[in-house]
């Protein structure tokens, strides 16, 4: 693959497979000739005309050729167009602009790249040959908790189109008409109209709207339920849906029978999917959807592999419910299901750590396994706008994993979502990326930029106050920057849905920074009265943080608001406890050094339970419930 950069640096999302940039730009012509506009993908032509708004289409001017492989308008470029689904060829020079897709979606993606190239009425001279490495790329709305709003979903679909994602799987666990007991019933008129609008917007943005059904908890393996399921699919078909999925995840009982599941899915495939020429391949999520849950002595996965029609896609989350995808892991599952796995990546989903925001970078997935998977979709948070940071990165990874740049893509995502306060959002996101202790044992790096200074300072201070001044100043600057970022974010009006989602955490973030500043002033300890003033302020800040934690985000699972929990908060708490201890020793005092710790610990030999976080509410100690079926030994308990 050829990638040349000259004086002009061209950055594209996702990174193309082949890009040649000449050291020259041209002005977008005031007058142009559109060649092929009547034949080409109408969604692509619409985007082009919007970009050329105010320009004149005539028989003179620069030639702009647009179309799909085989069209007369781009026929002479047939050899340049990549022979891949959704591939495209794009060329810009002083004589002609060429936007040629291998298929209609490829042409649309050529326009999305063209839109990124166009800046201030100028275009770089480029030649691009591009195509996706992974066939299905997108999002599965499959989390527990508050489903996304209709407006949020509309915004998401437009975001996917811009970032060359082609799949949105609609499967919110709390939609009553998606799962038991109402999966057999049609949607009410209002909800049906909204779904119809979502399908239309998905089509305009070249996204496959995949409607998923979750019947396993109460399905009866009889003809009546088969007919009811097909009737429901037919209802969705009439609303415009052309892609379907069946989920058997997180269930127990008779619905987990792999033989019966395969029979039902093949029936759907043969009696519905294959009968209608405009329906895409059927997708299923198995009951044993990760390696740790697969019965080593059972035949669930191999039964699906042997019995399911070859065209049916099988979803997979990895070695665990929450895990990154490795070569060994995907080889293991592909051998059993006899087809490339369709990856359901459970990040940044936070339905098991709902008191945290997961705004950090996307990393950990093998970048050399594109050919081993048929799809890669991310399961997001219930916070739709905040999830776009990770979604943007997944779009880049799934399109061209070998050129995926973790940190640059993360920074670009933040700049895309909130350009007017990108530095402030980056500061906030840097310290809001870890999940904290959780039942799945999945963690993320956080506050990496200051972690070394924090560790050095804390170690030295605990050992006798001989800390390095540079480390101390680094921490001071960090807390100052956190406060500034919080204030700027709270007043930002550029992306109101985003700010509304993160506001409780931003308030907590600011209080955390203020507490950090005051604790460092206690460390400097000018005199006894000054120390006591700062001590009292810290205790007041602790109370304010407790109030936010008790009053905001009060979901029934992991209520509250946690921020900067991996490095920043432990640093502040341990420094506070240490400096109070030193003060008490020096002045024979008895100041309380308690921080907001959890005095209780969960002890269990059940893997899914032992790491579940605890909560204290008044005189009660609560265990955060698991979303999935809890298993131990040969028994299953819900």
Question: Where do the protein language model's features map onto the residues?
Answer:
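Active-site-proximal loop/turn and secondary-structure-junction residues that shape catalytic pockets
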Residues: 145, 156, 174-176, 213-217, ...
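Structural motif
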Residues: 34-40, 65-70, 100-102, 142-144, ...
């Amino acid at each position: 693959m050829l990638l040349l950069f000259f004086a002009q640096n061209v950055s594209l999302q996702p990174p193309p497979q082949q890009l040649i940039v000449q050291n020259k730009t041209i002005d977008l012509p005031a007058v142009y000739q559109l060649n092929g506009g009547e034949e080409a993908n109408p969604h692509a032509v619409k985007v082009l005309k919007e970009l050329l708004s105010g320009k004149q289409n005539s028989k003179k001017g620069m030639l702009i050729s647009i179309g799909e492989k085989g069209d007369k308008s781009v026929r002479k470029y047939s050899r340049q167009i990549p022979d891949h689904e959704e591939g495209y060829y794009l060329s810009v020079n002083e004589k002609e602009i060429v936007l040629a897709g291998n298929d209609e979606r490829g042409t649309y993606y050529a326009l999305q790249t063209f839109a990124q190239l166009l800046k201030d009425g100028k275009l770089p001279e480029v030649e691009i040959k591009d195509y996706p490495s992974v066939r299905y790329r997108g999002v599965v709305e499959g989390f527990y908790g508050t489903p996304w709003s209709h407006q949020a979903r509309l915004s998401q679909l437009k975001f996917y189109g811009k970032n060359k994602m082609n799949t949105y799987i609609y499967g919110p666990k709390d939609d009553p008409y998606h799962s038991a007991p109402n999966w057999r019933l049609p949607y009410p008129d209002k909800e049906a109209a909204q779904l119809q609008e979502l399908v239309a917007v998905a089509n305009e943005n070249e996204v496959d709207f995949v409607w998923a059904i979750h019947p396993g908890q109460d399905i009866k393996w009889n003809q009546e339920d088969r007919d009811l399921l097909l009737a429901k699919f037919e209802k969705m078909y009439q609303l415009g849906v052309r892609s379907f999925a069946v989920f058997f995840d997180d269930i127990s009982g008779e619905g987990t029978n792999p033989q019966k599941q395969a029979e039902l899915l093949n029936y759907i495939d043969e009696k519905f999917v294959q009968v209608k020429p405009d329906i895409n391949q059927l997708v299923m999520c198995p009951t044993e959807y990760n390696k740790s849950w697969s019965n080593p002595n059972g035949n669930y996965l191999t039964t699906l592999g042997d019995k399911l029609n070859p065209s049916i896609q099988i979803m997979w989350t990895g070695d665990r419910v929450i895990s990154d995808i490795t070569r060994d892991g995907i080889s293991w599952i592909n051998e059993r299901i006899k087809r490339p796995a369709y990856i359901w990546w459970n990040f940044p989903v936070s339905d098991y750590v709902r008191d945290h925001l997961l705004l950090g970078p996307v990393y950990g997935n093998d970048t050399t396994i594109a050919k081993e998977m048929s799809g890669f979709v991310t399961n997001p948070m219930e916070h739709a706008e905040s999830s776009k940071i990770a979604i943007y990165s997944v779009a880049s990874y799934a399109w061209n994993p070998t050129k995926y740049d973790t940190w640059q893509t993360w920074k670009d995502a933040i700049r895309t979502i909130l350009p007017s306060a990108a530095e402030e959002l980056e500061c906030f996101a840097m310290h809001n990326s870890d999940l904290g202790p959780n039942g799945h044992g999945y963690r993320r790096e956080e506050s990496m930029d200051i972690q070394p200074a924090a560790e050095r300072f804390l170690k030295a201070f605990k050992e006798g106050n001989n800390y390095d001044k540079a480390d101390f100043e680094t921490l001071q600057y960090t807390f100052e920057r956190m406060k500034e970022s919080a204030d700027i974010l709270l007043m930002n009006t550029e992306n109101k849905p985003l700010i509304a989602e993160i506001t409780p955490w931003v308030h907590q973030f600011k209080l955390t920074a203020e507490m950090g500043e005051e604790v460092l002033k206690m460390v400097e300890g000018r005199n006894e009265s000054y120390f006591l003033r700062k001590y009292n302020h810290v205790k007041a800040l602790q109370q304010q943080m407790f109030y936010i934690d008790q009053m905001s985000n009060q979901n029934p699972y992991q209520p509250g608001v946690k921020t900067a929990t991996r490095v920043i908060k432990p640093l502040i708490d341990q420094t506070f406890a240490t400096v109070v201890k030193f003060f008490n020793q020096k002045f024979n005092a008895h100041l309380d050094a308690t921080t907001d710790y959890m005095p209780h610990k969960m002890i269990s030999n059940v893997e899914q339970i032992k790491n579940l976080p605890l909560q204290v509410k008044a005189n009660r100690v609560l265990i955060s419930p698991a979303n999935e079926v809890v298993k131990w030994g040969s028994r299953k308990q819900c």
